[in-house]
UniProtKB/Swiss-Prot annotation:
This is MICOS complex subunit MIC27. It is found in: Mitochondrion inner membrane. GO terms for cellular component: mitochondrial inner membrane. The lineage of its organism: Eukaryota, Fungi, Dikarya, Ascomycota, Saccharomycotina. The chain crosses the membrane at residues 101-120, 150-169. Belongs to the apolipoprotein O/MICOS complex subunit Mic27 family. Component of the mitochondrial contact site and cristae organizing system (MICOS) complex. Component of the MICOS complex, a large protein complex of the mitochondrial inner membrane that plays crucial roles in the maintenance of crista junctions, inner membrane architecture, and formation of contact sites to the outer membrane. Keywords: Membrane, Mitochondrion, Mitochondrion inner membrane, Transmembrane, Transmembrane helix. Residues 1-100, 170-240 are mitochondrial intermembrane. Residues 121-149 are mitochondrial matrix. The keyword Membrane applies. It is a multi-pass membrane protein.
Length: 240
């Protein structure tokens, strides 16, 4: 006959109704047995309990670390946003009248100008992708002009919407616009780029285009005066 699973059972255990504990658990140091007040017997594997507690502490530690890191990043982000807002208030939005009365209107018009520039410089609006743009269309054929090709090239498509939007801002909120340009030149763009772009602007616009326009304006004014003088002389001779 095989060995009894519960070993030797005392009569007083049976009489008291105490739980029966398997024999291999009684003297096993890896398993802790506890009897609850209601008589139930609880067996606790010590090694497993220690491992679970270790994992639990590690999970709690990682959770607290992640939460602390998230709060740190949130605080840093809030500080960064507040720093940016303060920078814009101190360096760009310094004209309170423009900010309070014109900035919203200027933004709406600038957005409209940006979309207008996008539409004007789109190839689809100049016949490049028209179904009639083929040799089989006959008299209905749409051939893009040189002006449309100039207006729809890649540099123009990339810059025209922004140029129009910037023009709106420069006309409706000139102080804010100039402050924004100064801040970009001072704190965003490299110094070499700013110097080169300023020199290029002076050569092309100030010393080139504006001088030619002034010369053309002066020539037109002189020619207009000469023409008026000639007309007056002609009228005076005819009257005599």
């Amino acid at each position: 006959m095989g060995r009894d699973f519960y070993g030797e059972i005392r009569d007083e255990v049976i009489k008291k109704g105490e739980p029966l504990v398997p024999e291999f658990i009684k003297n096993n140091s890896d398993i802790k047995t506890t009897t609850l007040p209601n008589g139930n017997s609880v067996m606790e594997p010590v090694a497993i309990t220690e491992w679970v507690n270790k994992v639990r502490r590690k999970v709690i530690h990682n959770k607290e670390y992640v939460e602390a890191e998230i709060e740190t990043q949130k605080s840093a982000a809030r500080n960064e946003v507040e720093t940016i807002k303060q920078y814009w208030r101190d360096n760009v939005f310094t004209d309170r009248k423009e900010v309070d009365e014109h900035i919203v209107t200027a933004s709406v018009f600038a957005l409209g100008a940006w979309f207008f520039g996008s539409v004007v410089s789109s190839k689809r609006n100049w016949g490049f992708q028209s179904p009639w743009n083929s040799d089989k269309s006959g008299i209905l054929k749409r051939t893009p002009s040189q002006f449309s090709k100039l207006l729809t090239n890649l540099p123009v498509r990339l810059t025209l919407p922004w140029i129009l939007a910037g023009t709106v801002y420069s006309q409706l909120t000139p102080n804010t616009w100039n402050n924004a340009l100064s801040a970009i030149k001072r704190d965003v763009l490299p110094k070499d780029v700013v110097e080169q772009s300023s020199a290029l602007y002076d050569d092309i616009i100030e010393k080139g285009l504006k001088i030619q326009l002034r010369s053309l304006n002066q020539s037109a004014h002189e020619n207009l005066q000469a023409s008026i003088c000639s007309i007056r002389e002609t009228i005076a001779e005819n009257v005599k």
